Amino acid sequence: MQEITIERTQHPKQKPTDQTRLGFGNYYTDHMFLMNYDEGKGWHDPRIVPYGPIELDPAAMCLHYGQEVFEGLKAYRTEDGRILLFRPDRNMARLNSSNERLCIPAIDEAFAVEAIKKLVSVDQDWIPTAEGTSLYIRPFIFATEAQVAFTRHRSCFLPSSFPRLAPIIRKGSTQ
């Protein structure tokens, strides 16, 4: 299994103090997981880095053909403070199922789960503790090859980021 390098942020963000007003996708953690794919090398260079913009060639296939897949899963705290992920193995299996449909190279599902666990560990202070809240994890993969003509993917990118999440349906709601 590949080693995941970690570069910790030198400028931590301020965490929201009112966990009842988090909303969906309004806050992002300090770090993100990245990994590249190149034909011949496979998936390589797994790393956790400070959250920030991703550079992308304007001719990247994901921009012209929508060659992108994503999954969503949650990390949450139990009453005794443990951190749990909700069925990450199934999420990674679904991600690979989507990859297959779009001819995106498969990921090692077990490695992807371990990478997410490591990222959750690095940013564990971002996991909200209020009832019904969680840390939403969004692994996604997109084709990065600069090619306007449609072809099989030779290069892809796997980032994962964490928007904080309040309950989507509030307790007592009729929706």
Model-derived features with residue positions:
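Conserved alpha/beta cores of soluble small-molecule-handling proteins
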Residues: 1-175
